[in-house]
């Protein structure tokens, strides 16, 4: 399905989505830090997020300093997949808040552009 007009085909990036995997015990503190940095606003709503439980696995290698477990031992731990949005201009603040509040030595996170039509 193609665009019917040039105007309908124009999009802009004004927000991004952060997806991060957080241990169950750290969900609230990470959310609080992200919200304080400006994440979680959608229209007239604040503190917007979505999370679902899952199981994370990892094996800390030599030279790692794992928060949970020991080097050389594979671990499985209950985690949440946490998603929230933020304005692009706050990306540095949001990522800094994530890294400072997340308990893992190497937090796993993704940043996605959210395209919005120009109207």
Give the label of every model feature segment.
Residues 1-119:
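Hydrophobic structural segments
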């Amino acid at each position: 399905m193609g665009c019917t007009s040039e105007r309908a085909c124009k999009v802009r990036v004004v927000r991004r989505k952060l997806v991060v995997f957080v241990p169950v015990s750290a969900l609230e503190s990470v959310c609080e830090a992200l919200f304080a940095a400006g994440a979680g606003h959608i229209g007239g709503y604040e503190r917007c997020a979505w999370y679902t439980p899952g199981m994370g696995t990892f094996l800390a290698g030599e030279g790692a300093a794992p928060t949970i477990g020991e080097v050389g031992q594979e671990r499985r731990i209950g985690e949440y997949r946490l998603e929230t949005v933020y304005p692009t201009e706050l990306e540095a603040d949001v990522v800094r808040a994530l890294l400072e509040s997340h308990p893992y030595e190497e937090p796993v996170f993704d940043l996605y552009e959210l395209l919005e039509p120009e109207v």
